[in-house]
């Protein structure tokens, strides 16, 4: 019997994933990665109940120190530099999957699984296993996992790849799991009161009032601290002008936020930093790729360009979905081929 280590959060997705794996004949080992201070949170208790019901091993691993040093540090530094960071992508790549694979090796488990809505399939074009987006772009989570290396992908199982969320809840109800109607988590997991309150609590004196300005430097009003705003934001600015305005630039060094018309957000090219490709860059350079510059984006077509060791993505058409610090992920025929952070 082959073993699989599965990350379990206490939600319905990972719980049903564990059930499906057991039904498929695997020896399942449930692992909860706890980044919180409390040792017995509601999520941990829910996971214990599910594992007891399924008759599988459950282990809780404390990752608080790594989580603070890597994810929270990245999150705070990102907003402090005027970016809009993506902490879940960094957490998945640098902590969660790394630890799950280490635990799998400890148990001599052949596979690692999670409750993500994505799949791993073999690409005939690129002759390797790659992440592939699932049928519903609304639930597809391949975007979040683009930084996982090909050697990890070969050992990954995503049991939910062919299911809808409704079907998963129906399975959970059918097998009498208490989490069948548990709400999905919203926002970042470590900021239960919202990311703005988390920033205020942790950055404190670094958040100071500054000026809203137009592109010519004229003062339009005051903001509460540039860290509390994001590119493209329109609501919650606390300023009344004769026409709708959007945040087009955040100047962290001067504590100024530039406001402008929606049309000023449209660009046709972005530069990448911290890029990571599952397919050799040279194989992608002349291909038309679908780029998703944020998780909620359905994507825009264009091509990768390299100029003096810098990598850019040139869109076929301008769009207003790009924010500094967000990750842009590239797809070819549904397969995830790479991505990077928008500079």
Curated annotation (Swiss-Prot):
One of its GO terms (biological process) is tRNA wobble position uridine thiolation. Gene3D superfamilies: Adenine nucleotide alpha hydrolases-like domains (2.30.30.280), HUPs (3.40.50.620). Its EC number is 2.8.1.13. GO terms for cellular component: cytoplasm. GO terms for molecular function: ATP binding; tRNA binding; tRNA-uridine 2-sulfurtransferase activity. It catalyses: S-sulfanyl-L-cysteinyl-[protein] + uridine(34) in tRNA + AH2 + ATP = 2-thiouridine(34) in tRNA + L-cysteinyl-[protein] + A + AMP + diphosphate + H(+). The record marks 116, 326 as: Interaction with tRNA. It is found in: Cytoplasm. The active site is at residues 91, 189. Disulfide bonds join 91-189. ATP binds at residues 7-14, 33, 115. Residues 139-141 are annotated as: Interaction with tRNA. Its main location: cytoplasm. InterPro entries: MnmA-like (IPR004506), MnmA-like_central (IPR046884), MnmA-like_central_sf (IPR023382), Rossmann-like_a/b/a_fold (IPR014729). Keywords: ATP-binding, Cytoplasm, Disulfide bond, Nucleotide-binding, RNA-binding, Transferase, tRNA processing, tRNA-binding. It is an enzyme of class 2 (transferase). Catalyzes the 2-thiolation of uridine at the wobble position (U34) of tRNA, leading to the formation of s(2)U34. HAMAP family: tRNA_thiouridyl_MnmA (MF_00144). Belongs to the MnmA/TRMU family. This is tRNA-specific 2-thiouridylase MnmA 2. It comes from Fusobacterium nucleatum subsp. nucleatum (strain ATCC 25586 / DSM 15643 / BCRC 10681 / CIP 101130 / JCM 8532 / KCTC 2640 / LMG 13131 / VPI 4355).
